[in-house]
């Protein structure tokens, strides 16, 4: 529509220019040249205006076509998800087997109980030095003359005197079968420590005496320390 209106305007302008051209041609040749140049300028302006209008029309058509096309929205479709039924049974899991520790024999358990009663857990084992060993053996050997300790004696003689001075329990013959090693050892420790409990021996000395009974190497070291102090 706009192009048609522009074409009509151009036609009217040309008609007017032609009328003016005919009038001016009658007036003179000089004015005719100026009118021709003026007409050419107007024609160029009209052509430029027509081009601008045509470009505007094309742009409007292009934008209207873009807006009319539906825009594609990604993931516009709804995702169907079926609900989980309530009657599904849980997956069967393997039964958990409790871990079983090492099997402890009743003889070893009785020995550990006897040791736990003699050795309290909250007390730390004292360090065995020469003075403690001397005091321990002096309290257990009343028949040993301390004045004669300066005399040189062999380790075997000194150990024999110490063993004789300790209280010995008589061997009881029974018709029962022979006990296993852990049970016989625990009974031996209880028999050795029972008289010391009755005599009111200090707990520290009892613990050191128990170490001497459990570790024969400590007995040999104790005899060596006694021999060195006597020399």
From Swiss-Prot:
Residues carrying Phosphoserine: 24, 29, 31-32
Keyword S-adenosyl-L-methionine among record annotations: no
Entry-linked InterPro entries: Casein, Casein_beta, Casein_CS
Record-level Gene Ontology MF annotations: cysteine-type endopeptidase inhibitor activity
Places the protein is found: Secreted
Annotated Pfam families: Casein
N-terminal signal peptide: 1-15
Residues where Phosphothreonine is found: 27
GO biological process: lactation
Gene Ontology cellular-component terms listed: extracellular region; extracellular space
Record key words, sorted: Milk protein, Phosphoprotein, Secreted, Signal
Tissue: Mammary gland specific. Secreted in milk.
Chief location: secreted
Family (UniProt): Belongs to the beta-casein family.
PANTHER family: BETA CASEIN, BETA-CASEIN
Function: Important role in determination of the surface properties of the casein micelles.
Protein name: Beta-casein
Protein source organism: Rattus norvegicus (Rat)
